[in-house]
A protein has these predicted regions:
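Structural motif corresponding to the early beta-alpha repeats
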Residues: 56, 72-94, 115-116
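Glycine/proline-rich, positively charged
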Residues: 26-27, 40, 87-184, 190-197
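Conserved short secondary-structure transition element at the edge of the structured enzyme core
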Residues: 44, 140, 191-194, 201, ...
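N-terminal binding-site loop/beta-alpha segment at the start of enzyme catalytic domains
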Residues: 1-77
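Short glycine-enriched loops at secondary-structure junctions
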Residues: 55, 153-157, 202-203
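Alpha-helix-loop-beta-strand connector modules within alpha/beta enzyme cores
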Residues: 62-81, 132-143, 198
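Active-site mouth loops of central-metabolism enzymes
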Residues: 21-33, 81-91, 120-124, 151, ...
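Short low-complexity, flexible loop/linker segments enriched in glycine and/or proline
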Residues: 66-67, 163-165, 186-188, 211-215
């Protein structure tokens, strides 16, 4: 496994992380035993960054990941989750953080994201006095959150504005061969010393799955787009 620095945090993260939005499932429910096996196998193979969120798998992703991190696995990885609240109410935002710590059954988070934010939400809600940003700082002072970050699905121009606030240690953005809209923002964040995590590196499977058109054009058993 290869590892890279996450901005100025001192964290060295595996270049391949484990996103827990889609864990092994049967009939729409998480197959807990198989999920725990897969998560722990990833740790054994060198993966040390695990990312989840409050509503993944109907709220069960954090619970299952927390169980997988028992027996000494928590100490071997960096844990990230996200707060979905887009509110001016800092206490409401903090309440969700406290709930997530219980679900994960951990004492602290290595990275905590403002989930899927845009510039308007940041300026009008999340960063107002007494709001979520103030509670994020309180959580950091308490040692509950190590590093503050944001995840992003919006207009690419907002990325650089958010970076320029100077409030974040890192960010999580979409980037792959099919979607390079955040390329400039990623380079800018790097130039400012921020950590960057990429989501969807294979386009939700579109870049890894076999293409029907290519299968018809190319003889043999094509298993993936890169192979073709």
């Amino acid at each position: 496994m290869q590892y890279r620095e996450y901005g100025k945090t001192g964290m060295r993260l595996s270049t391949l992380g484990y996103g827990c939005m889609r864990l092994p499932s049967v009939d729409g429910e998480v197959d807990e035993d198989e999920a725990i096996r897969c998560l722990r196998e990833a740790v054994e193979r060198g993966v040390n960054y695990f990312d989840t969120a409050w509503f993944y798998h109907g709220g069960n992703s954090e619970i299952v990941l927390g169980r997988a991190l028992k027996d000494g696995y928590r100490e071997r990885i960096f844990l990230s989750t996200k707060n979905k609240e887009k509110t001016t109410d800092g206490k409401k935002w903090r309440s969700l953080l406290d709930e997530q710590l219980v679900k994960l059954d951990v004492d602290y988070l290595d990275v905590y994201h403002f989930h899927g934010i845009n510039w308007e939400q940041w300026t009008e809600k999340l960063s107002v006095p007494g709001g979520p940003l103030d509670e994020m700082r309180n959580a950091q002072k308490e040692g509950i959150v190590k590093h503050c970050a944001f995840s992003f699905h919006g207009d690419a121009g907002d990325v650089m504005k958010l970076v320029d606030t100077g409030e974040f240690d890192g960010m999580l953005v979409q980037y792959n061969l099919l979607d390079r809209s955040n390329e400039e923002g990623i380079a800018y964040a790097n130039s400012k010393g921020m950590g960057v995590i990429v989501m969807g590196p294979v386009g939700g499977g579109r870049l890894g799955g076999a293409s029907k058109a290519l299968q018809e054009m190319i003889p043999g058993d094509v298993k993936s787009t890169p192979e073709a």
